[in-house]
Design a protein with these regions (language model features):
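A generic structural signal for well-ordered coil/turn residues at beta-strand boundaries
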Residues: 80-81, 144
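Short, solvent-exposed loop/turn segments at secondary-structure junctions
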Residues: 2-4, 24-26, 51-53, 71-76, ...
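N-terminal anchoring/stem segment of glycosyltransferases
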Residues: 1-29, 41, 151-157, 162-172
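Catalytic core and acceptor-binding pocket of nucleotide-sugar-dependent glycosyltransferases
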Residues: 89-172
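A structural signal for short, well-ordered beta-strand segments and their strand-loop junctions
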Residues: 20, 45-48, 67-68, 123-128, ...
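Short glycine/proline-enriched coil/turn segments at helix->beta-strand junctions
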Residues: 13-16, 23, 39-43, 61-66, ...
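GT-A fold catalytic core of metal-dependent nucleotide-sugar glycosyltransferases
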Residues: 28-79, 86-87
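Short loop/helix-cap segments at secondary-structure boundaries that form the rim of catalytic
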Residues: 11-13, 38, 57-63, 142, ...
């Protein structure tokens, strides 16, 4: 609910449909691959639920499959981050490839779908369109961006945390 609230109130984005994929058919982040099977046409824009949108977002719609370049983290992990994804048209081959041997691929790509997308698919990356709370937990809001990622620190979105970002969530 926070994501829809932030999109509707701060992002400036217009959309035809807002959907949260809740099917838990796979382990963790691999569930988000189902969106490539469900959405096979038109312009698509995906956001992880653990982000903060606090201002008008730039145009993130892309023709080619596009993810974030994870410029904020150690390269030893992966240089991709799938907290924001866009594509136009049919990218169902991503899900179909995963679905054929999902059990094996979940183990092979223990770092998650970022690693799988980077190693197995032709994926573009955005320029710097957001930043991570990683190493910025006590810093003021970065006015150079309109989106901050929590990157597995979603606990900081819970009541009791008093960072600047909580002002952009649904009133509690």
């Amino acid at each position: 609910r926070n994501l829809k609230y932030m999109i509707d109130n701060y992002s400036g984005l217009k959309y035809d449909e807002f959907v949260v994929i809740t099917s838990e058919n796979y382990r963790g982040v691999f569930n988000k691959l189902q969106m490539f099977d469900i959405y096979r046409d038109g312009e698509n824009l995906y956001f992880d639920l653990d982000i903060c949108i606090y201002d008008k977002v730039p145009n993130l719609i892309r023709k080619d499959l596009t993810v974030l370049h994870a410029w904020w983290r150690d390269r030893a992990h992966t240089s991709f981050n799938s907290s924001i994804i866009s594509w136009t048209g049919d990218q169902s081959h991503v899900y179909e490839t995963f679905k054929k041997d999902w059990y094996y691929l979940q183990g092979k790509y223990y770092k998650g779908i970022d690693e799988m997308l980077e190693k197995d698919f032709d994926v573009k990356t955005y320029d710097k369109v957001c930043y991570s709370i990683q190493n910025n937990e006590y810093e003021p809001k970065n006015k150079d961006y309109s989106i901050m990622l929590f990157n597995q620190r979603q606990f900081m979105m819970e009541p009791g945390w008093s960072g600047w970002w909580s002002n952009y969530f649904l009133p509690r």
